Amino acid sequence: MNADQQILTQLAKEYREVAFAPVNEERRALWKALNGLRECRPLIMMDQLPWHELDVDGDLKLRCRDADARIVEDALRKQLYQAKYFPADKVFEPYLELPKTIEGYHHGAVRREVTLAADEKNDVVSHSYVSQLSSESDLENLKFPDIRVDEAKDKKRWEKVSEMVSGILPVRLTGVRMFHCGIWDDLVEAIGTDNFFFFFADEPELLHKAARRMADICQSLIDQLTEKQLFDAYEPTVHCTGAYTDELPQDKEKNVRPGDVWTFGLAQMLGSVSPQMFEEYEVEYVKPLLEQFGLVYYGCCEPLHNRIDYIRKIKNVRKISMSPWADIRAGAEHIHGDYVISRKPNPAYLAAASFDPELVRRELQETCRAAKENGCTCELILKDVSTVQYHPERLAQWHKIAVEVAGEW
């Protein structure tokens, strides 16, 4: 056993204890209740964290030398770190994930951009996209995907990783989970953020044609993933939230179709247009795409409290995002128990020069009051945390407060 294997074997043993703890089954049951719109306390998840700022006592320091071994080591160390400091309601799965090698999977244009980093260690950077769409002929820049799978390569990768962890944890080749259906988030990368809103006034017909092409590209992805049997029915999460449910065949291994899985839709760039334009430019195009799936998570950072009536036109929506920019009380009144409120508490509270725990508590309590008064189930999803100002203890403090507030339900 070489040095890398010794490191991974020890980490796998530690993770196995976490993953086989009874609390994971309890959490699965809670997520199934929440996602089934049954009475349940608010559930908590924490994701998209600034890992480069969080190393405590060397817990996250990589020690393996082999490139593949370091990928496995990184995944195990992060899971163990989260289990130690802020587990929330995360289910720690009893296996190692190894995503299948899928080539040609893209959503239209090849990104051309300039980036600017405030912290060279942070992978969250500013993006300025070079416009590739100014006339109808430029629609050809929005390319259709051609998906390919290298099964022989995946077999070798699986064998290598299985050997690395000495068989202590099973290794699971995973397919496509929580399919992304966000034509506008992809399209803005081709148009450029500087030009985007001018198109609604200056080039509405071109914008509609671009949306139509992006929807066709998305449909092509769905068709190819279905044909090549790449959808994965077992989805632990959807857009940073628990995806466990009794309503989909999550143990299905073959012939998995869109109707067997979750998807998530979003139109963050349309957060500044009117609700009526949201229907015209978003709902009309993505409704036929989203309705092919078993369940839908809708929304991300855009405020949706005044668009619930339009989202209702999409069948199978189960969760609706309420971002920090949403009016949570108005959103809860419109949702009225028909969907899970997926509340995104403000990550800026952890990024300020100083941390105010009472500000965090008030925000979470306001969410829970609004949900309960309107007969809604809700989840508290801390995500998009680009910095904690190198104070990792803030995440543990946020976690403690969230657990206390959820316990008051």
Residues covered by each model-derived region:
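Membrane helical hairpin/interfacial module
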Residues: 62-112
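Extracytoplasmic/secretory soluble proteins
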Residues: 2-21, 102-133
